[in-house]
């Protein structure tokens, strides 16, 4: 709620006591609990769901709050009856009167810092401003707690260099660092669907699952490390993740129609677009990939990441950019890509579906990327594909 909202104005004018949602959560739900928080620019929802699933399989009745829909749970939040609470820790501001990041209120004992990049240009002026907020979060973690982070992340390095008083464990994939990481994954499948988990250079167990991408391998390592901090052995954590179903809107398969597979993904940042498409490319090999991308977040609509956008989708064979809001910079960007036939602009859902139809082959993988509803393109595209295959169009699963 913002200033100008009638309810906000009434509260202020009548001198009614008020607090932000994150502050209420800290006072009424998180107080006296072992808070396990997952923060970072990318992967928060998936990593939170992974950690929660590990604890669930280990018999913990943890409370939780996830900013998405974990497929292994019926709801996105519950109070729980144990001392533990798992929370997705968002860096967005708390309220119109409290511009600190939401996660400042949570006071975690176990903290996962997945990564740090510039985002939320509507409230942050620079990546340094986000680093400062992460530093404020780190200041709240007790000395007997634990911080888990990737070994290679310069912006997290900067945030932690501002001061920290808590032990750190780091994660790495393959041999990306010369020194030894506390947790490491050795890929046994190029697409990340199978890998060995290594702790202090000792093999723990092999994880085989339906997810792809090195970003999800990193997410898994962080979740395993966090679960160990509260007493779940790594081999039990790996066994749980082998049965992990994922999160809705994270490379969620919507339909498979005569060899055309349609996926829904929440990617709304160049890094997320790139890692998602890279994971799919490694799984499907040379099979064609069509990407439908809606730059919808405030940061994307402002064109903050325009210099990275085209390159972020280089693993797709054709990229259809949705310009549903008259973004001149996007038209200019795609026009400047030249006549290579890989990047196209669509100004309506009908036009975008037509572009897909004109570039369709079998087999084919279509990835729809947006952090919103994308004007209902998911159901309309699937219905069009069903009609073309002689099937009766039906509703997508909720």
Identify what each model region corresponds to:
Residues 1-5, 72-73, 153-158, 177-179, ...:
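Short, charged/polar "capping" segments at the starts of alpha-helices
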Residues 1-149, 155-166, 221, 227-230, ...:
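Phosphate-binding loop of NTP-binding sites
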Residues 19-26, 64-68, 163-190, 208-214, ...:
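Beta-strand->loop->alpha-helix junctions that form or flank phosphate-binding loops
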Residues 135, 161-167, 202-206, 212-215, ...:
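ATP-dependent carboxylate-amine ligase
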Residues 187-203:
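Acidic-glycine-rich active-site phosphate/pyrophosphate-binding loop
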């Amino acid at each position: 709620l913002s200033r100008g909202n009638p309810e906000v104005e009434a509260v202020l004018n009548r001198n009614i006591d008020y607090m932000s949602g994150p502050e209420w959560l800290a006072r009424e739900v998180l107080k006296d609990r072992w808070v396990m928080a997952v923060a970072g620019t990318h992967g928060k929802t998936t990593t939170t769901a992974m950690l929660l699933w590990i604890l669930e399989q280990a018999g913990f009745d943890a409370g939780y709050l996830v900013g998405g829909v974990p497929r292994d749970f019926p709801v996105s939040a519950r109070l729980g009856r144990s001392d533990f609470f798992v929370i997705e820790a968002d860096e967005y501001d708390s309220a119109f009167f409290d511009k600190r990041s939401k996660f400042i209120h949570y006071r975690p004992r176990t903290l996962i810092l997945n990564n740090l990049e510039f985002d939320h240009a509507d409230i942050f002026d620079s990546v340094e401003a986000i680093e400062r907020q992460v530093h404020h979060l780190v200041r709240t973690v007790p000395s007997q707690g634990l911080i888990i982070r990737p070994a290679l992340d310069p912006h997290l390095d900067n945030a932690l260099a501002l001061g920290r008083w808590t032990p750190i464990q780091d994660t790495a994939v393959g041999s990306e660092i010369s020194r030894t990481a506390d947790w490491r994954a050795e890929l046994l499948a190029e697409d990340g669907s199978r890998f060995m988990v290594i702790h202090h250079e000792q093999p723990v167990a092999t994880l085989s699952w339906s997810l792809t991408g090195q970003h999800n391998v990193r997410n898994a390592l962080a979740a395993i490390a966090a679960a160990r901090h509260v007493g779940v052995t790594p081999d039990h954590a790996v066994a749980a993740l082998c049965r992990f179903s994922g999160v809705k809107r994270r490379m969620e398969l919507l339909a498979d129609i005569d060899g055309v597979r349609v996926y829904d993904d929440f990617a709304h940042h160049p890094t997320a677009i790139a890692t998602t498409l890279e994971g799919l490319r490694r799984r499907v090999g040379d099979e064609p990939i069509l990407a439908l991308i809606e730059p919808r977040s405030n940061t994307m609509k402002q064109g903050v990441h325009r210099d990275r956008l085209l390159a972020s989708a280089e693993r797709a064979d054709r990229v259809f950019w949705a310009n549903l809001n008259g973004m001149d910079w996007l038209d200019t960007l795609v026009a400047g890509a030249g006549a290579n036939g890989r990047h196209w602009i669509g100004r309506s859902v009908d036009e975008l579906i037509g572009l897909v139809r004109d570039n369709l082959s079998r087999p084919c993988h279509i990835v729809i990327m947006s952090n919103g509803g994308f004007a209902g393109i998911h159901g309309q595209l699937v219905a069009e594909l069903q009609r073309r295959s002689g099937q009766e169009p039906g509703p997508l699963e909720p």
